[in-house]
Amino acid sequence: MAKTALKVKAARKPKFGVRAYTRCQRCGRPHSVYRKFGLCRICLREMAHAGQLPGVTKSSW
């Protein structure tokens, strides 16, 4: 889990645009965040399996 200070820091608009980065809205993880959902891969998988993301289904082929 991310510290509260890091979540607040990421929410602020940086002085330079290239310093902006995404964090998971649920757990605060800074890596592998899907922009479309605003969630990291781990939270996305958990919520999809629980059926909390409408329209998201497990793919199979």
From Swiss-Prot:
Described function: Binds 16S rRNA, required for the assembly of 30S particles and may also be responsible for determining the conformation of the 16S rRNA at the A site.
Upper classification of the organism: Bacteria, Bacillati, Actinomycetota, Actinomycetes, Propionibacteriales
GO cellular component, one term: cytoplasm
Keywords for this protein: Metal-binding, Ribonucleoprotein, Ribosomal protein, RNA-binding, rRNA-binding, Zinc
Cofactor(s) the protein requires to work: Zn(2+)
SUPFAM superfamilies tied to this protein: Glucocorticoid receptor-like (DNA-binding domain)
UniProt binding sites for Zn(2+): 24, 27, 40, 43
A matching Pfam family: Ribosomal_S14
Protein name per the record: Small ribosomal subunit protein uS14B
Subunit-structure text: Part of the 30S ribosomal subunit. Contacts proteins S3 and S10.
One GO biological process term: translation
PROSITE patterns associated with the record: RIBOSOMAL_S14
Co-factor binding details: Binds 1 zinc ion per subunit.
Organism: Cutibacterium acnes (strain DSM 16379 / KPA171202)
Gene this chain is encoded by: rpsZ
Keyword Hydrolase: no
Similarity annotation: Belongs to the universal ribosomal protein uS14 family. Zinc-binding uS14 subfamily.
Molecular functions (GO terms): rRNA binding; structural constituent of ribosome; zinc ion binding
